[in-house]
Amino acid sequence: MPFSLLPRTIVHGLPDLTPKMLKKLGVELLMLDFDNTVVPYTTDVPTPAVRAWFRTMQASGIRLCVVSNSKKERVQQFCRQWDIPCFTHCRKPSRKGILRAAEAMKAPLQACALAGDQIYTDTLAANRAGVRSILVEPIHLHNVWLRLRHVAELPFIHLAKRRMKHEQSD
């Protein structure tokens, strides 16, 4: 797949991804980055809004899984708590972890999407794997490196928003 840093969709947070929206996009399997997408880096406890979103998504029939670069036990504990599959050591922006998750979940790539907070890892990996890339605003930019990375991503975010606006007007 092409090397692209432009997400196909941008949302404020996971609760903005509704089952209706995802079904309209043809998404059957939503892969989730973990840190700063589902929960902040500093905790494994989701906000009440994200907990409600998980319940809504699970009731909707859209399947969920976590694809994380992390190897930490806390990711696996979280996934056990919510009864969702977890794929760690994904090495995004490599596409291998995404392809491994899609194959394990028996989902065709065209029916998959990856929601994550980083363009240089999540968006790039999704685009390279041939799944829909969904950029979620980071939950918390708690240190200077995260803020600097986010600033470096802003040109791509602006380009993607312009493209999305143009596609909606067609």
Predicted regions span which residues?
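Asp-based, Mg2+/Mn2+-dependent phosphohydrolase catalytic module
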Residues: 2-32, 39, 43-44, 48-114, ...
